Amino acid sequence: MSVTADDVRRIARLARIAEPTDRIDTLVGELNGILSWIEQLNEVDVDGVEPMTTPVKFPLPQRADEVTDGNCRDKVLANAPKSDEGFFVVPKSVE
């Protein structure tokens, strides 16, 4: 599979970005290079290899689940543009 200049224009239109008229030839080459690299990855034999998220296994520290109130209401409300009696004040969204 190879990318053409028309494909680059179509991708730009679908992504709703400005058509890169001065860089189309460069982008065609870059996208074809990426696709070539992906085709090389498809040739790797992975039969018998278990899917994994990381090659290094390290357990995450475990802790007991405890319900708390967070003790940071004032800090959180300090970030709000408007608050009243400990609650966020937002514009009315339903009539």
Swiss-Prot record:
Function: Allows the formation of correctly charged Asn-tRNA(Asn) or Gln-tRNA(Gln) through the transamidation of misacylated Asp-tRNA(Asn) or Glu-tRNA(Gln) in organisms which lack either or both of asparaginyl-tRNA or glutaminyl-tRNA synthetases. The reaction takes place in the presence of glutamine and ATP through an activated phospho-Asp-tRNA(Asn) or phospho-Glu-tRNA(Gln).
Xref: SUPFAM superfamilies: Glu-tRNAGln amidotransferase C subunit
Catalytic reaction list: L-glutamyl-tRNA(Gln) + L-glutamine + ATP + H2O = L-glutaminyl-tRNA(Gln) + L-glutamate + ADP + phosphate + H(+); L-aspartyl-tRNA(Asn) + L-glutamine + ATP + H2O = L-asparaginyl-tRNA(Asn) + L-glutamate + ADP + phosphate + 2 H(+)
Gene Ontology biological-process annotations: glutaminyl-tRNAGln biosynthesis via transamidation; regulation of translational fidelity; translation
Keyword Protein biosynthesis attached: yes
Keywords annotated in UniProt: ATP-binding, Ligase, Nucleotide-binding, Protein biosynthesis
Origin: domain of life: Bacteria
Family (UniProt): Belongs to the GatC family.
Enzyme class: ligase
EC number: 6.3.5.-
Key word ATP-binding present: yes
One Pfam family of this chain: GatC
Name of protein: Aspartyl/glutamyl-tRNA(Asn/Gln) amidotransferase subunit C
Stored InterPro entries: Asp/Glu-ADT_sf_sub_c, GatC
Species this protein is from: Maricaulis maris (strain MCS10)
Disulfide-linked positions: none
An annotated Gene Ontology molecular function: asparaginyl-tRNA synthase (glutamine-hydrolyzing) activity
Quaternary structure note: Heterotrimer of A, B and C subunits.
